[in-house]
Amino acid sequence: EYANDAYGGSMGFPSMGATLYQKFADFVNNNAAIVKSYGMIPRAWNDGVYYGSYTSYFDPAIEINYWSSGWGGYTLAKASTLDSKGHGLINTNGDYYFILGKDDRFTPGTSTEHDPYEYDFCENFDMNRFMDGSVIEEPLGGMFCIWADYPGAETEQEVAANIRLVLRA
């Protein structure tokens, strides 16, 4: 979001170049230092951390929510790369996000539209297998995410009914 907001469109990081990307890394690291100074653990989504071929350093104390392996020309670091650089990883696989207003449903015996592993999340989710196919032996954990892109699209009761099976998995 930082790069997209600062540099326009949905492809912000490729538009930055190495110098501006370093400023982004400095921004992230400075904020991580502030978070750590209060005795908390900094966390970030994986989108911009070690993006593409940029070589800027990110504090390994930053835990990474790994949600996406990239899309059409948007080259994100592999989970295994982030792991090798010392970041703790939380598997927040974007194939299993529940997005209000997107008609997301998790039903036993079916797989999601974008499921690269062709298995049913409700029955076979593997916390060690990340969206890019990397297998991380000791991730920090997994997280099921609910995004309110359209907050008025569903009531709390509808959301609860639609995610019931996932929460039991």
Question: Where are the predicted features?
Answer:
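Flexible, acidic glycine-rich loops studded with aromatic residues
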Residues: 47, 54-62, 66-169
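Active-site neighborhood of glycoside hydrolase catalytic domains
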Residues: 1-63, 68-74, 79-86
